[in-house]
Each structure stands twice: as C-alpha cells, then as structure tokens.
C-alpha cells in the first residue's frame, strides 16, 4: 500500500499535469487519438490513490496497446508513469533493487515515447511533470540537476509549441505551464529566468491564485524551493472517463 507521502507526490503533481495535459495541445492534423488516455485515466489515477487493482487494469490496458503497436507513444508514456509510481512504492518499502530497476525502465519507456513523437504535447507534458517531481526527490545533486534539466527543456518546448495559441488556452493550463517553468529554472539555479516567468504570470494571469503565489515569491528576498506555483485548483474524479 502506498504511503501518504507517495500518494501526495503523484496526486499533487503527476495527476494534476496528466489530467490537464491535453488542454495544452495545439490543433494537430490529424489530432492525436485520446482513446487510450480516456480508457485508462480513471483507473490510473485511482491506482495512484491506493487502488492497486485499478492500477493493474490501467497498466494491462497500456500493455495490450503496446502489444498491438510497440511504438504507441502515448501508451509508452502512460505505462511509464505507472512504473514510476510503482518504483516509488518499492523504494519506500525498502526494496531498493526493484525500485531502481523500475525507475530505469520507466525512464527508458518515457524517453522512447517522446522520441517517437518529439513534438507531441500529449507525451511531453507527462515526462516534463514526472521528471520535475522525480528531481525533487533525488539525493545526488548532479543527477537531480540532469533530470530537472530534461524536464525544464520539455516545458520550454511545450511553451514554444503553444506560442501561437497560448493566450487562448485555459487558465489552469497556462498557469501550470508557466509555473512549471518557474519552478524548473529556479531549481536549476537560474533565478533570472525563474523571476521572468513569475513576472509573466503576474502580468498575464492577474487576480488569480497563480499570480498571488508568483507575486509572493517575487517579494521574497530569495526564491524558495519549491515555490508552490503549480498544482493549483486541481480536482480529479477518478471514475470519470
């Protein structure tokens, strides 16, 4: 059974981004299929909340999709997200060997998914979000920095892909993306870039919780880590498909 700390890690960060990630997408021709996401989302999120049977169903659905097409990028990324969760459970139970093995497998699958669809926001968002979360829990500073750099680069690419339509995206999507960038650059030690994104939040998202938190961070003598800019107003219905 996942600990409260494990559940908070994935519910507060991974679920928030994955459940809103497709709202970041620009129109594509043809648009990416959401069939898999719609079929596994409820079970995956319920699994992150502690329902192991639901997580098993979601993982089996991903594995069935990959059996049909090993290059199904969304299936790879969703499957990898579940494996990341299982790796965290293993680590916290003291099974370091299994946790390490699962962590490596998850990163491999997630990277493969992004390589197959490098401009697919539906695969970039999960990797960016999960890696930002992972980096915050890596004890080795250099390893954490490398992981966080990949995450932040993904967020930058997502912003570039969304540039033409950014103002029309939902408030939550804009806030989470700009907040993710501010958190990423702050974690990497580039406070100038972090402050630039915080300032952008205050200007483009005025009178919102994102702007309030960004303004508070900017007013501090030094930027806190983390700043708590992301995962604002997230609500998940695990049974909604």
Give, region by region, the residue ranges found by the protein language model.
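Boundary/linker segments of alpha-helical solenoid repeat arrays
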Residues: 121-122, 159-171, 203-216, 239-241
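The canonical Cys-X-X-Cys-His
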Residues: 227-239
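Short, flexible, mixed-charge glycine/proline-rich loop motifs
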Residues: 219-227
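Flexible helix-coil transition and linker loops at the boundaries of alpha-helical arrays
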Residues: 29-30, 63-76, 111-123, 157-172
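Short coil/linker segments at helix-helix boundaries
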Residues: 37-60, 81-119, 129-164, 175-176
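Bacterial Sec-dependent signal peptides at the C-terminal "C-region" and cleavage site
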Residues: 13-32
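Bacterial N-terminal signal peptides that target proteins for export
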Residues: 2-13
């Amino acid at each position: 059974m996942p600990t409260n700390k494990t559940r908070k890690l994935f519910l507060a960060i991974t679920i928030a981004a994955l459940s809103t990630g497709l709202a970041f997408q620009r129109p594509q021709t043809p648009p990416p299929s959401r069939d898999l996401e719609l079929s596994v989302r409820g079970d995956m999120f319920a699994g992150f909340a502690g329902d192991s049977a639901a997580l098993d169903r979601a993982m089996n659905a991903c594995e069935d999709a990959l059996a049909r097409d090993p290059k199904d990028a969304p299936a790879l990324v969703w499957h990898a997200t579940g494996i990341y969760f299982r790796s965290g459970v293993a680590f916290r139970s003291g099974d370091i060997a299994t946790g390490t093995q699962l962590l490596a497998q998850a990163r491999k699958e997630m990277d493969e998914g992004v390589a197959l669809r490098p401009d697919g926001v539906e695969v970039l968002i999960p990797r960016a979000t999960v890696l930002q979360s992972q980096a915050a829990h890596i004890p080795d500073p250099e390893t954490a920095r490398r992981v966080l750099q990949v995450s932040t680069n993904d967020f930058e690419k997502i912003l570039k892909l969304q540039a033409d339509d950014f103002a029309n995206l939902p408030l939550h999507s804009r806030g989470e993306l700009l907040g993710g960038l501010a958190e990423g650059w702050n974690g990497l030690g580039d406070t100038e870039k972090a402050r630039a994104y915080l300032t952008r939040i205050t200007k483009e998202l005025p009178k919102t919780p994102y702007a309030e938190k960004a303004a508070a961070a900017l007013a501090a003598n030094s930027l806190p880590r983390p700043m708590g800019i992301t995962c604002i107003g997230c609500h998940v219905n695990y049974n909604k498909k």
